[in-house]
């Protein structure tokens, strides 16, 4: 299957962390999320990276392509999605695995070094959503994973 050619970002000013809003039992990856996004009418997966439950980091949309993950910010940001984020009843929950969080930290360190001056942001900072279901700043600074619907 030929990949869609997207406009390239001119700058990378932010790295957004998202969750897939899936239950812990749903071990999905880029293939499934791509399909969900296409079912919504998108041309491809909106995120640049997806981190599966086992900590595997999968490439989504080309890293330099404009993403589709944070309205109004896609032109100058990268989107990273953690699989999970809700419990079996559909409530927001920081149910991410230690392997996921280790992979997230490693990926973010790499991206922040690569894109000097980029800032780390949670999706809920720019949209009325609970995504990514945890307090990103607290986790980044103190390594404490705490469920949060607003950060």
From Swiss-Prot:
Keywords: Antimicrobial, Bacteriolytic enzyme, Cytolysis, Host cell lysis by virus, Host cytoplasm, Hydrolase, Late protein, Metal-binding, Viral release from host cell, Zinc. Its cofactor is Zn(2+). It is an enzyme of class 3 (hydrolase). Pfam families: Amidase_2 (PF01510). The record marks 129 as: Important for catalytic activity. Its EC number is 3.5.1.28. GO terms for biological process: defense response to bacterium; negative regulation of viral transcription; peptidoglycan catabolic process; viral release from host cell by cytolysis. One of its GO terms (molecular function) is N-acetylmuramoyl-L-alanine amidase activity. It catalyses: Hydrolyzes the link between N-acetylmuramoyl residues and L-amino acid residues in certain cell-wall glycopeptides. SUPFAM superfamilies: N-acetylmuramoyl-L-alanine amidase-like (SSF55846). It comes from the Viruses. GO terms for cellular component: host cell cytoplasm. Zn(2+) binds at residues 18, 123, 131. Binding to the viral RNA polymerase inhibits amidase activity. Interacts with the viral RNA polymerase. This is Endolysin. It comes from Escherichia phage T7.
